[in-house]
A protein has these predicted regions:
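Alpha-helical cap/lid subdomain in secreted, periplasmic
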Residues: 47-230
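Serine-esterase "nucleophile elbow" of acetyl-processing enzymes
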Residues: 1-52, 203, 207-210
Length: 230
């Protein structure tokens, strides 16, 4: 079993992939989430996993913000992250480094956002990434479940007929949502806000556990009390 997503999938404490084995017969989970991932990055990583790994029992994908983009370089030197929100990771499979969180130089990031980034385009591309990933996983006959990290990943008003048709070609039965078209962010804020660390926007582990239990598996089974109280 493999998980892909952003920091709502892999962070500095246990996230939802940690708890999936508690409900699926303890099948081994490989968490390939990366903080700052955009949907192009997530799609590429999911497709690469499908090509790289044999006998994938299930793939779980949590889509990220439409505003994010990636920067590719061939740098292999050590990444000095101190004082910077962005970071890069060398990918042996693709033979390049991916910058997560946007361009590392603020002026270039702002220039890109001002002159090249377009909101309508980003929403359209997100649907493309979802659709492409579904087509590939279907071809490989890999079972999969898709989710969103918050309700801004998708929208109800479409900019064009093409965007509407692309939306209609996505298999939405493969998605799990909270309260209509909401994601983990809203689920955690609505139900587990008292557990948040002050100043932290990422859901605490208890919210991730209940996301798996209540949303993903809709299970009545409770974990051991000592685990729950950690």
């Amino acid at each position: 079993t493999i998980a892909h997503g952003c920091s709502f999938t892999r962070y500095g404490w246990p996230c939802w992939p940690k708890f999936v084995p508690w409900f699926n017969g303890n099948i081994r989970m490989i968490n390939k989430g990366r903080s700052g991932s955009g949907n192009e990055t997530i799609s590429r990583a999911a497709i690469n996993s499908a090509m790289k790994h044999d006998m994938i029992e299930h793939m779980y994908i949590m889509w990220s913000g439409t505003d994010r983009y990636e920067v590719i370089t061939k740098d292999r030197i050590a990444d000095e992250r101190e004082g910077r929100a962005t970071y890069y990771v060398w990918d042996d499979d693709c033979q390049w480094s991916t910058w997560y969180g946007g361009h590392p130089e603020k002026d270039k990031h702002e220039y890109y956002r001002r002159h090249f980034w377009n909101e309508e385009h980003q929403y359209y591309r997100t649907l493309e990434h979802i659709h492409r990933t579904q087509l590939f996983l279907d071809k490989k006959r890999i079972p999969y479940t898709m989710m969103i990290f918050n309700n801004y990943v998708l929208r109800d008003n479409y900019y064009s007929e093409s965007e509407q048709e692309l939306y209609n070609n996505i298999d939405w039965t493969k998605f799990l949502f909270y309260k209509g078209r909401k994601g983990l962010w809203e689920f955690a804020e609505d139900n587990y806000k008292e557990y948040y660390i002050p100043g932290e926007s990422h859901p605490p582990p208890i919210a991730h556990y209940h996301w798996v239990k209540d949303i993903m598996f809709q299970s009545e089974v409770l974990c051991k009390e000592d685990e729950y109280n950690k």
